[in-house]
């Protein structure tokens, strides 16, 4: 089977088609990334008017800062909780669609509603429900003798931001898992049922391996989501507290750059975070292309 490359009448047309994307990439990624890398090697005054080259001193100081290391491990813990919990809960709800006979459309619509809610609004919603004084959920917990106050308890604060972040991301994961499960040939499921395999066994032995590429894709997407898109949730719910218990890397960058006006340190932290995201992207492009072949 022979293949030929498309031929454009004008030699400039391909460049014109690619130009908008290149311009957006340069303005909104390459230029800011270059600025962050430059500032990370400088000692900058709070207003950014003067600077002095200091090499890697900002990075050395960064990795000797106990508060930064704490935020680093907080990010690892937070992103792990958000990613694992979000994927498991979404997969469970997507698998339930097959067993809902009546009201399945309403169920699917209900599962997609959180996606229409902004992250900050999602955080405020759960803050109202978990309000220590008048929250509906805290009142219910008080009936069982459990005292809830996420402003003073670091574990409760972490649970709140993880819960709100997972709730916000459920719709996105549910949509992909549902589409992946529906794409599985029904003949495989029916053949396994005829052979005596129950619903649980059919799910773990047939469905789960076949949706592995989608699961891996969502794993990477949810890690990036936990690193970046959860900033509004943390800012609205806990502001990184109590005692920096919920201060992630992205929130520490914001606090030191915009509040503390330490541009060099925040730039160095941005470079470290950018490196982590690049690694995740490389992993995604390297492994997510694995194909599933139906025999």
Swiss-Prot record:
According to the record, the segments passing through the membrane are 12-32, 81-101, 110-130, 157-177, 208-228, 263-283
> Which keywords has UniProt assigned to this entry?
Cell inner membrane, Cell membrane, Membrane, Transmembrane, Transmembrane helix, Transport
The cellular location(s) given in this protein's UniProt record come to: Cell inner membrane
One Gene Ontology molecular-function label:
glycerol-3-phosphate transmembrane transporter activity
The residue spans the entry assigns to the Periplasmic side of the membrane are as follows 33-80, 131-156, 229-262
Keyword Transmembrane helix tagged: yes
**Alphabetical list of PROSITE patterns matching this protein:** ABC_TM1 (PS50928)
The free-text function statement in the UniProt record for this protein reads: Part of the ABC transporter complex UgpBAEC involved in sn-glycerol-3-phosphate (G3P) import. Probably responsible for the translocation of the substrate across the membrane. Can also transport glycerophosphoryl diesters, which are hydrolyzed to G3P and alcohol during transport. The G3P moiety can be detected in the cytoplasm whereas the corresponding alcohol is usually found in the culture medium.
Protein name (Swiss-Prot/TrEMBL)? sn-glycerol-3-phosphate transport system permease protein UgpA
């Amino acid at each position: 089977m022979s293949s030929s490359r498309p031929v454009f009448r004008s030699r400039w047309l391909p460049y014109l088609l690619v130009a908008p994307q290149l311009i957006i990439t340069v303005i909104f990624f390459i230029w800011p990334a270059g600025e962050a890398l430059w500032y990370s090697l400088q000692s900058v005054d709070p207003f950014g008017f003067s600077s002095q080259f200091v090499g890697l001193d900002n990075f050395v100081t960064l990795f000797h800062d106990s508060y930064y290391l704490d935020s680093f491990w907080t990010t690892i813990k937070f992103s792990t909780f958000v990613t694992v919990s979000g994927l498991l809960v979404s997969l469970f709800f997507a698998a339930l669609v097959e067993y809902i006979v009546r009201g399945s459309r309403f169920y699917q619509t209900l599962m997609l509603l959180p996606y229409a809610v902004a992250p900050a609004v999602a955080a405020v919603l759960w803050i109202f429900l978990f309000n220590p004084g008048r929250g509906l959920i805290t009142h219910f917990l008080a009936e069982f003798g459990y005292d809830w106050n996420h402003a003073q308890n670091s574990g409760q604060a972490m649970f709140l931001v993880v819960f709100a972040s997972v709730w916000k991301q459920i719709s996105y994961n549910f949509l992909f898992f549902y589409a992946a499960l529906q794409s599985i040939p029904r003949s495989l499921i029916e053949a396994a049922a005829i052979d005596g395999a129950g619903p649980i066994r059919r799910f773990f032995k047939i469905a789960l391996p076949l949706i592995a590429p989608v699961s891996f894709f969502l794993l990477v997407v949810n890690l990036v989501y936990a690193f970046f898109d959860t900033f509004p949730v943390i800012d609205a719910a806990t502001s990184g507290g109590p005692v920096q218990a919920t201060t992630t890397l992205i929130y520490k960058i914001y606090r030191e750059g915009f509040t503390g006006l330490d541009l060099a340190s925040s730039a160095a932290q941005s470079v470290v975070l950018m490196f982590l995201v690049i690694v995740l992207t490389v992993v995604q492009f390297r492994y997510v292309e694995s194909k599933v072949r139906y025999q």
